[in-house]
Amino acid sequence: MKSKIIALGDSIIKGVILNIESNGKLHYALSDCNIVDQVANKTNHEVVNLGKMGCTIEAGERILDRHLAGIENAEYALLCYGGNDSDYNWRAIAQSPKGEHQPKTPISVFEKTYARIIDKVRQAGLTPIVMSMPAMDAERYYQFFTSVFSDEEKRNVSRWLKNGTDAIWAGHELYNDAIKRVAAATDAMLVDVSKAFSQPEKYLCVDGIHPSRAGQKTIASAIAHAIV
């Protein structure tokens, strides 16, 4: 009987990619070679993918709580959070750049909740595997999310950022560092997939944040190597 991996996280775990249609329109879809399925094939495990697009760490804890009773026969819990937690409501910033704007999950809440999730999966008998966020292309992401904004809204976002897209990258790295701190503090296995994205433009979709099929393959190989 194969061992089982429970995967919890956001759209990266879910396997979401951004496709470009023949007419140039963009749409999100599920990859036919997502990370979790590739890890299962490489390590001879069964998988239960509980990933959800847009999932923050607090929403992830609620999903885990609903499924705790059914995961006790699994071996690993693959965890991937941070991309949505570290992000902002860019539409709100575009419309009110002088207002108070914070990431979707305060970093202190993010760290405490992540540590609690790790403890819960351990209590259920699983080995937690904490995945860092892959590197992002901040400039590409900026161009993507502002593409639907008016010129005035784009100027508002640009003024709010002050340091340009470097500020987006810095926020991303702040939460990536938090992930590594939590993994170290809880003595959880860390798979730092950001190291595999030395040239993120080769491994990301046009939105600058979701791994392409090539990126998913790279991440899956890093995770499988850590498990085997």
Predicted ranges, named:
Residues 55-64:
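Structural motif
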Residues 32, 60, 113-114:
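Amphipathic coiled-coil/heptad-repeat helices and related helical stalk/stem segments
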Residues 65-228:
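Alpha-helical cap/lid subdomain in secreted, periplasmic
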Residues 1-51, 67-73, 77:
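Serine-esterase "nucleophile elbow" of acetyl-processing enzymes
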Residues 29, 57, 100:
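Short gly/ser-rich anion-binding loops that grip negatively charged ligand groups
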Residues 11, 17, 53-56, 84-85, ...:
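Gly/Ser/Thr-rich beta-alpha loop segments that engage phosphate groups in nucleotides
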Residues 6, 12, 48-51, 57, ...:
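Generic detector of intrinsically disordered, low-complexity, polar/charged segments
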Residues 45-46, 51-56, 134, 197:
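Short, solvent-exposed turn/loop segments enriched in Gly/Ser/Thr/Pro and often Arg
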